[in-house]
Amino acid sequence: HEKEFWIDEHGDRWLFKPVAERDEFVAHGEESAYRIGRLIDPDAVEVRTIRLNGRMGSIQRWRTDLKADFDFRHTLPENLTSDEVAQIQREHVLDWLVSNHDGHAKQLIRAKDGHVYGIDKGQAFKFLGKDNLSVDYHPNRACGEQEPYYNTVFRAAKDGKIRFDPAVTLRHIQEVEK
């Protein structure tokens, strides 16, 4: 997917992801996921739908405060902190709510202060009505993509390798329902 950086008048970097005219719904889906995500994480990475140089796409503020090992691709679930597990539960609620089943380990990033952010919700609503809310559901397997990190984490919990508090998930569901 095409991506490019833009700098705003304040010197902040933004990642622009243009989409083809037939795929404008993807950009709108990303912004919708951000707006819903703010209900449970006011610090969610800002995403907007925008037209730049005649091209529609989504644009998100670029994070500059990330840890050196900023994503979870090399993090086994048993090495997660309890705070990371709780934040991953929060992002799981959002991704299931918007039917985004592409939340693999590279789409969860962590800041130096320990905050976990879910990014790249470009598949939001893609499988809505056809999806299966199961930790075994992995529709992007056919594309050779990693499974959603949530599947990996919750399978580790099922196997007794990590612990998580279901009340955390319930709290985030209730926050969205308000």
Language-model features: where?
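Conserved ATP-binding subdomain of kinase catalytic cores across diverse folds
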Residues: 1-71, 95, 99-100
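Poly-acidic low-complexity segments
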Residues: 2, 84, 98, 163-165, ...
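Conserved aromatic-histidine-acidic binding/catalytic patches
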Residues: 21, 25, 80-81, 85, ...
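Charged, low-complexity, helix-prone segments enriched in Lys/Glu/Asp/Gln
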Residues: 26, 92, 172-176
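Conserved kinase catalytic-core segment
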Residues: 34, 39-42, 76-131
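A short, charged
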Residues: 44-47, 102-103, 107, 155, ...
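Charged, low-complexity surface segments at secondary-structure and domain boundaries
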Residues: 73-78, 158-159
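C-terminal catalytic region of ATP-dependent kinase domains
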Residues: 111, 115-178
